UniProtKB/Swiss-Prot annotation:
Pfam family, one: Tub
Domain of life: Eukaryota
Protein name (database record): Tubby-like F-box protein 10
Region described as Disordered: spans on this chain: 1-23
Family classification: Belongs to the TUB family.
SUPFAM superfamilies, per the entry: F-box domain (SSF81383), Tubby C-terminal domain-like (SSF54518)
Tissues in which the UniProt entry reports expression: Ubiquitous.
Length: 352
């Protein structure tokens, strides 16, 4: 009798959950939007209070649609709310301040959203990466789950792959940067299909997953002196800022905004300190060859493109033995910025 009774109990629980969700989903759309709007207004601009908005979006489809309508995308609001924010470009007028924690023994790197100023800030966990050695190459697998860094996982968001010398890198996204983008022919990309299971943690489950090349990073030979600053160049396929993430999900299409070319900002030599210096505005406190600032430069393949030598798009620097700050802004996303910063770890032969 017990074997017959258990399925009935499970069925009863499932029916109860469906009935409960039906009651929440049956509320007027205007009422649901007003509730979500008040939750955001009641101190939900920063984490951890902002998790209440995520809870609202998890109730059912109607509440999720209301949250998408009320909560503005990262480029407009300047706030990271949902996992989709990690693939959206940062705000234009100010940087998103994050920090990276390194665990050398486990070859792990953790990205956090900075909530407070100071190295004692616990932060809001965003992504994690782990370094793997695969033959002559080194790979950094990036995931939304620090405990699951498999490329076959729904938490997988992309990876960074280096050459043998550790001077040239390619960034792979698990989702296409634009329509008709071609996936790489690596073995790991063949494990992904177009299907997804309910409850997927992927940033955009509606779009087929794979490994799409969205950026390249190269470290050039150091012509100044030993232990001098690294010379760094990045070519990135950046996400569109002209349409909201919600619209891209509805149309299942993504736009290509062209290529962004970045290079490291040239430091100045400080005679008194006898070292190369950059102005990090107090965000970097420990001298390190890993410290850098990236600015936009003109694209050689487009004669009409214009660079901006003053606005720092991404800066990365050391504040403790295993803690680094990471500040990024438009046109980079958090995922792209994190991947670029990961490339600074490890020895660069003939570059330093």
């Amino acid at each position: 009798m017990a074997a017959v009774r258990e399925p009935r109990e499970e069925a009863a629980v499932g029916e109860g959950e469906g009935e409960e969700e039906g009651r929440w989903g049956g509320l007027l759309p205007e009422l649901v939007e007003e509730v979500v709007r008040r939750v955001e207004a009641s101190g939900g601009e920063r984490w951890p209070a902002r998790k209440d908005l995520v809870s609202c979006a998890c109730v059912c489809r109607r509440w999720r649609e209301a949250a998408a309508a009320v909560v503005r995308p990262l480029p407009e609001s300047g706030r990271i709310t949902f996992p989709s924010s990690l693939k959206q470009p940062g705000p234009k007028d100010f940087p998103i301040q994050c920090f990276v924690k390194r665990n050398k023994k486990k070859s792990m790197f953790y990205l956090y959203l900075g909530l407070l100023n100071g190295t004692m800030d616990k932060g809001k966990f965003l992504m994690a990466a782990r370094r793997f050695r695969r033959g002559p190459h080194t790979e950094y697998v990036i995931s939304l789950d620090a405990d699951d860094l498999s490329q076959g996982s729904n938490a997988y968001v992309g990876k960074l792959r280096s050459d043998f010398w550790g001077t040239n890198f390619k960034i792979y996204d698990n989702q296409p940067p634009y329509d008709d983008a071609k996936t790489s022919s690596t073995r790991s990309s063949q494990r992904f299909g177009s299907t997804h299971r309910f409850g997927s943690r992927r940033i955009c489950p509606q779009i087929s997953a794979g490994n799409f090349n969205v950026g390249q990073i190269s470290y050039k030979y150091n012509l100044l002196k030993s232990r001098g600053p690294r010379r760094m160049f990045c070519t990135m396929e950046c996400p569109s800022t002209q349409e909201t993430w919600e619209n891209s999900l509805k149309t299942k299409s993504l736009r290509c905004t062209g290529t962004t070319v970045l290079r490291n900002k040239a430091p100045r030599w400080h005679e008194h300190l006898q070292c190369w210096c950059l102005n990090f505005h107090g965000r970097v406190t420990v001298a390190s060859v890993k410290n850098f600032q990236l600015v936009a430069t003109a694209d050689p393949s487009h004669p009409d493109s214009v660079g901006d030598e003053e606005t720092v798009i991404l800066q990365f620097g050391k504040v403790d033995s295993n803690i680094f700050t990471m500040d990024y802004r438009q046109p980079l996303s958090a995922f792209q910025a994190f991947a670029i910063c990961l490339s600074s770890f490890g020895t660069k032969l003939a570059c330093e």
